[in-house]
Design a protein with these regions (language model features):
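Short, hinge-like loop/turn segments at secondary-structure boundaries
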Residues: 69-70, 155-157
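Helix-biased detector of long, well-ordered alpha-helical tracts
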Residues: 102-107, 190-194
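Small-aliphatic-rich amphipathic alpha-helix that forms the alpha element of a beta-alpha
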Residues: 37, 97, 103-151
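N-terminal amphipathic, basic helical "cap/leader" segment at the start of enzyme domains
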Residues: 1-92, 194
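C-terminal helix-cap and adjacent tail motif
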Residues: 4-11, 16, 158-194
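Structural motif
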Residues: 94-97, 164
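Short Asp/Glu-rich motifs
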Residues: 56, 148-149, 155-156
């Protein structure tokens, strides 16, 4: 089993949200994806993150009431087509999972570790969805950095940050391989200077 898992990871690629199919994710798979997503390094077992699921009509409603309206406020001269495109971004996938980093004050556990734990949730959700055969991509885009969008998703302004949106859907084509860094460019073996 572990050899199969390593083979999967060595070939893993994301299908872009703009090319995926808005196929639904069945509830058993979704439950497993979320369960895997929460089995991450979490110093102190603080669970310093929230997971918000947008599926079905919620994708359209959130786009209409929040993404489109906010984009129009930020870009008052944008043409209708561009606003419509932004409003419908969540419809590219069958489900969109938002992960919010929600750090808490702690004497021993640094903020950075809590934020890394939230990023690990995103990565685990991405990997588990892909391992089940779904197309999946982890994105941020402009709305991940917008406080009003954060608040609309239940985040606390000045404390929380959106770690990412994981788009999950179907695929009709396997994604193309992209250039990966060469190991000798990114890996070093430390040794004491003589």
């Amino acid at each position: 089993m572990s050899k199969t898992f390593i083979d999967f990871l060595l070939k893993r690629r994301s299908v872009t949200a703009k090319t995926m199919l808005p196929s639904t994710v069945n509830q058993i798979d979704l439950n497993n994806i979320i369960s895997v997503g929460t089995r991450v390094p979490d110093h102190g077992a603080l669970a310093p993150w929230k997971i918000i699921i947008l599926q079905g009509k919620a994708r359209e409603e959130f786009g209409k009431h929040h993404l489109g309206k906010r984009f129009k406020i930020l870009n008052p001269n944008a043409p209708y087509e561009t606003i419509n495109y932004e409003e419908n971004k969540f419809l590219r996938a069958g489900i969109v999972i938002c992960v919010i980093s929600c750090p808490v004050k702690h004497d021993k556990i640094p903020l950075w570790e809590m934020q890394l734990s939230s990023a690990a949730v995103c990565h685990s959700i991405l990997i588990s969805a892909q391992s089940l055969g779904y197309a999946a991509q982890w994105l941020t885009e402009w709305y991940a950095y917008d406080e009003e969008i954060l608040a609309a998703l239940g985040g606390k302004i000045k404390n929380d940050k959106i770690s990412g949106f994981i788009y999950i859907g179907g695929k009709n084509l396997e994604p193309k391989e992209r250039i990966r860094p060469k190991k000798n460019q990114i890996v070093q073996y430390w040794q004491k200077n003589k």
